[in-house]
Curated annotation (Swiss-Prot):
Disulfide bonds: none annotated. InterPro entries: DEAD/DEAH_box_helicase_dom (IPR011545), Helicase_ATP-bd (IPR014001), Helicase_C-like (IPR001650), P-loop_NTPase (IPR027417), RNA-helicase_DEAD-box_CS (IPR000629). Residues 1-13, 33-44, 71-85 have a biased composition (Acidic residues). A motif (Q motif) lies at residues 130-158. ATP-binding RNA helicase involved in the biogenesis of 60S ribosomal subunits and is required for the normal formation of 25S and 5.8S rRNAs. The keyword ATP-binding applies. Keywords: ATP-binding, Helicase, Hydrolase, Nucleotide-binding, Nucleus, Ribosome biogenesis, RNA-binding, rRNA processing. This is ATP-dependent RNA helicase DBP6. It catalyses: ATP + H2O = ADP + phosphate + H(+). It is found in: Nucleus, Nucleolus. It comes from Debaryomyces hansenii (strain ATCC 36239 / CBS 767 / BCRC 21394 / JCM 1990 / NBRC 0083 / IGC 2968) (Yeast).
Amino acid sequence: MSSDTEEASEEIEGNQNQHVNKQPENDDKMDIVEDEETPEEPIENDPNYMSKHHSVFQKFKSSVHDVKGEEVDEETPEEKEDIEMQDLVPLPQPELPRDKRLVSTAAHLNNLDWLTTPIYTAPEETKPFAEFQNPPLSSLMIKNLRNMGFESAFSVQISVLNLMLKDIERNRLQPDMRGDLLVNASTGSGKTLAYSIPIIESLQTVKVPRVRAIILVPTKPLINQVKTTLNQLSKGTNLSIVSLKNDLSIKEEGIKLQTNEPDIIVSTPGRLVDHLTNGYISLKNLQYLVIDEADRLLNQSFQNWCQILISKIDEFTNIKERNISNSWKLNVQKMIFSATLTTDAGKLSLLKFHKPRLIIVNNKEQLVNEMFSLPATLNEFKLQFGSAKSSLKPLILSKFLLSKNKLANVLIFTKSNDASLRLSRLLSLIMNKLGSETINIAYINSTNNTTSVRSKILKDFSKQTINILVATDLIARGIDILSITDVINYDLPNSSREYVHRVGRTARANQEGFAYNFCFGKGEAKWFKKLMAQVGRSEKNIEELELDTKQLIEDNDESMYKESLDELQQQVFNRA
C-alpha cells in the first residue's frame, strides 16, 4: 500500500482515540449499553470528520480503488462460449391439463353413476345355494329350491342374496340400515328368484298375516308366473300369497282381502291403486316393494300409480312423533328390476330411494353408457338383403329355416297382429309345398290373448307340439320357456329396449341361444345399426351372415310362392 494511505490511516485512528477520551466519565455505563444495543456507525459516514479530513479521505478512497482495479486486471478473462444459432421456431409450451375423459351431459345421464356407485358382477358366475354363508339360506328354502330343480344360483341371484341376506340379519337389531336396490340384468337371468328368495326368507316366521310385501308386474301372465314361483318357494310356511286380477269386481276382491289379509300381494299397478284408493289394502306393515320390468311400468302412468303408491307408503313411514311402539318400525325396502333399467332421473325420483345400491350384471370394462344388457350366452346375427328382395321375404324366411334346420323351438317376431297372422298362415302353406308337412306353425297376438288360449299355445310350444311360433311384442316380455333356441326378428323392433326383450326370450338361464335379424334395404340396415349402438354386450359382437339368395331360391320356388299367396288370398276371402 502507498505511504499516503498509511498516513491517512494513522491520522484517522489517532482522531478516534482522542474522541473516545473526551467522553465524560458519568456516561461510561450508558455508552456501554448503547454500544451493545446499536452497532457503531462507520467514521466515513460522520459529516464532522468528513469536513475536517476531506483530503485525507479522498486519497484513501482513490488508493483503495486503484488496488481493486489491479486485482481485477490480474485475472484471466473468461473465454466466451460460441453461441449456436437456431432458426426461428415457436417456443416449446407445456402440455395443457386435460380430463382423462370428457363426457357430455347427455352421455352422463345415460347411466346411473350419478345415483350411486355401481356393483358389477360377471354374467357367467354361479354358486350353489347350499354354499351361502354369513348368513346361510334356511334348510327349508334349499329343499324347496331343489324340488324346483335349482341347485345353483346365477349371477344376479348371487349379487342380490349377498346384500339382502345380510340386510335381513342386520335389520333385526338395526332397522335403519335398510337400503333400496336397483338391478339391471338381462332377461332370463333369474330376476324372479332373485327377489322372491329373500322375501320368503325374511317373512317365513311371521305369525299374524299382514300385507308385508307387494310385487308389481306389467302383465297378467307375469302375475301367474311370479305367484307360482312364490308358492313353490313358500312350501312348509304359513305365508299367504294372493294375486289381484280382473276376475272379480274391486268391491268383491276388496272384501276378500279384508276378510283374509295376505302376506304377499302380486298385482299390476292399476289394480293395486284401485284397492288403495278404496281403502281395501293397508300399507301400515309393508316391508318390501318390488317393481319388476320397471322400465315398462315407469313409462306408463296407470292412473299416476307411482305417486299414489309412494304417498300411501309415506303416510306410515314419515312418523312425526316417535314412541316405543313405532321406534323400531322398518322402512319400506324398494327393489327395482329390469333388463332395460331406465336412467331418467325424473321417473326414478318418484320412487324416493333411500341409500340406493345398484347392481349391474355385466363386465365393467365392456359396459357401454346405457342400461341395456344382453345374455352373455346369446349369439346374434344380421342377414342383409337388397330392397328388391323384400317381396320375397316370406319365401326367404322359409328357405332359411329349412337350410339351417331351424324347424323347432323357433320364435318369430313381427310388427303387428295382421303381420303375425298372415305370416303364420303363409309359412304353413310354403312348408307344406316344400315337403315339411309335419312342421306345426302357430301365432299369438292380442286377437287370441285370452288366458285359456294363450296358456294352451305356450304350453304346446314348450312341449314342441307347436314347432314355430309367430308373435308380436305382446310376448316379448313375461314368457319363460327355456326350450326356445332361436329368435328371429322378421320385422325389426321399434326401439333398443324392445330388441333386448325380444332376443331375451332365448339364451335363458345361462343356456346358449341364437338371434337372427332380417334387414331389407339400406333403410333397415341404418335403423338396425342405430338400435345396436345403445345395447351393451359383454364380449360378443353381431356377426354378418351372408346368404346368397340365388343359391337359396331355386327355379321353381318363386312360382310355388305365388301359388301360396293365391291360396292365402282365397282363404281370406272364404273367411270373409
